[in-house]
Amino acid sequence: MIDFLDKRKPFFIRIFLKFFISRKSIVSKQTSLQNLYKIFVVSLLIISFFYLLPASYKFVRKVIQPNLEIENSSSQKLTQVLEGKLLDENVLNDENYNSTDQDLVYQELYGEVTEEDNLESGVRLKASVLYQLFKDTNYSLKDVRVNKIAKPVEIGKLPYELKEIQNVKKRKELFIQIVLPLILEENNKILLDRKKLFAILNKNNNSKSDNEWLNKKFKQYGISKRDIPTLKRRMDIIPPSMAIAQAAKETGWGTSRFALEGNALFGQWTFSDKGIKPAAADAGTTHKVMMFNVLKSSVRAYTRNLNTHKSYRKMRYVRAIQRDNQGKLNSIELVDHLDNYAETGKEYTEVLKKIIKQNFLSDFDDVKILPSSEAVKNLI
């Protein structure tokens, strides 16, 4: 018989065997202590395996696969749709692809813009007509600054006469009156999605429709693996003051060729044939400026760009911190992280801050837009 007090065995094993045999009296003198020793070692290994496996998995996830924002591959799809192309074969053969992907990309750019909308809002009104329209509807920026309420006026195209208005103050006011409602309306849609997101996250159990909605939003914001923290950072508004400042800078307060001919408010590039070639482009450059059917499409593409592109990741992190600290967004701080938007870098961000301050654009950051007659009708 093997001596269980053999000093060659580990001390704690000898103590365990001695205690187990003496206290329980379930092993007779004829029982092979060698087998008992093997059983104990195997049991210890099994217990260690199931204890260490979860800890090892968490370590690998934390160290080897940190929670990074996934680069937005949907921006490439967006450009393809804008160019009128079908999604490429690699996307179509992807097992995660379904037939609604192309419709989703198009829908996310143009939203609820239908052919009927294009016919109505796509008409270019003269500046004199717009002045009268705003007067008849009591829509003035002075009232907006005081009452913090904007009228749901949707203008599809900028008037050609903008560049002919000699009074700089009047030209700027007309431009803001046109652009502000479009920005507020797009932000409203994002806020509704954000409200729904947090409502779903506060539920104990999600319904099938909740999960379908989440999957749609993950795809819309270019996120894989159901990364909720990234979705919360990306699904947020663009401060109106920042958006107006960028639109003003990119279009010369609505007087540029890109804005008047292509309804492009934010100078986003495309490398397709369907775009406007910059007159001052360097030799050998192939980029063009995106064209849109109506202004609201340009606004939607702009918010999508800032909320998904990796170049503005730092801006989204700072925005999330502002949300956590006080809830209100500070456009002056956020603008500092738009240096990748233009080739001039930090010089570009300083110009934006100057535009915001000189024109008191922060007054519009807490403005609400009245619901349109169509929205009211849907509530009845």
Question: Where in this protein do the model-derived segments appear?
Answer:
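Catalytic cores of secreted/periplasmic lytic hydrolases that degrade extracellular macromolecules
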Residues: 2-245, 249-380
